[in-house]
Amino acid sequence: MKKRYKVTALFEDGTSQCLVVGNFSSPTNAWCAAMRNLTPEGIARVQHYNVEEISK
């Protein structure tokens, strides 16, 4: 069953960005989708990811 997830990235300069909100079968799939939305330079700046399930 697919669930709704939000993936937020915290960057080294203290800013954050919501990368993906959507229906995925697992938190790992949501994280992978978020990675595809960043450039290699953006990926290098990420300090932390937060993947959270969104209630309906």
Curated annotation (Swiss-Prot):
Source organism, top-level taxon: Viruses
The protein's name: Putative gene 59 protein
